[in-house]
Amino acid sequence: MKKIVFIVLLVNFYFVGQLQAQLFGGQLKSTPSPFPPDHVNCNSRFQTAVVEVTSLTGRKWMDRNLGAEQVATSPTDAKAFGDLYQWGRWADGHQCRTSGTRTTVSSIDRPTHDDFIVVPTTSATDDWRNPQNNALWGINRSSGGVNNPCPTGFRLPTEDELRDERRSWVSIGGSTSNGAFNSVLKLPLSGYREQTGEVLAEAQGSPYGFIWGQDVAGSDNPSDARALAYFSGNAFENNYNRARGYAVRCIKF
């Protein structure tokens, strides 16, 4: 009697914005996405994969920026740049590099549109929201805040966590964009979006990378927020206008 050999095929793709499909014994099962259904995906060709990596600090991060198609293969890999978020905003579509703009600042935590809010450089606060809300992306390693754009179980990093990562680069390329890319995080020169709405990336001669943190600036400039900046000659944490668009790299909590 012939033996029938059953081959069990398990396909386990886990993408942000899609369902996790498992084909097991001929049955299709699905697991909900780790992102809410109103989390806007900027590119219909792909969904951002949620893959964990452990850095030299021992912390677990996503292996790519939110909105990135792949892990960076070089510092200037455009497929790894990802989206550009205004500090504290939800993933409503404003983070898409080709999103429209409007000049009316918001008085609520979640604007009812998907435009990048343009703020004049003469603004007193340089923020897309008035009055400001310092807790939109969480405080002190909390779960992420009301507008946390990261998947379930992840949040924006604190300034201390960003600083620890930067300091860990010393042995793998230095506290520069070289160290940023040589690290397990493979941080690319993702560019940024000015508060005027202009997108500046490496291709336009702007070889900079910025990663938002969840912390706001101190008493020296309380209207700003903290971010990690890195380029060919240096890397550091600094105060930046909340109306600017920077990349987001999520850390696990």
Q: What annotation goes with each model-predicted range?
A:
Residues 11-12, 21, 25, 30, ...:
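Generic detector of low-complexity/intrinsically disordered segments
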Residues 15-47, 249-253:
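Enriched but not universal
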Residues 19, 103, 111-114, 130, ...:
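Positively charged, low-complexity intrinsically disordered regions
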Residues 29-32, 54, 105-106:
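Intrinsically disordered, low-complexity segments enriched in Ser/Pro/Gly/Ala and basic residues
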Residues 47-49, 54-94, 118-253:
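C-terminal, surface-exposed recognition/capping segments
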Residues 83-99, 103-113:
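Glycine-rich, aromatic-lined ligand/substrate-binding cores of catalytic
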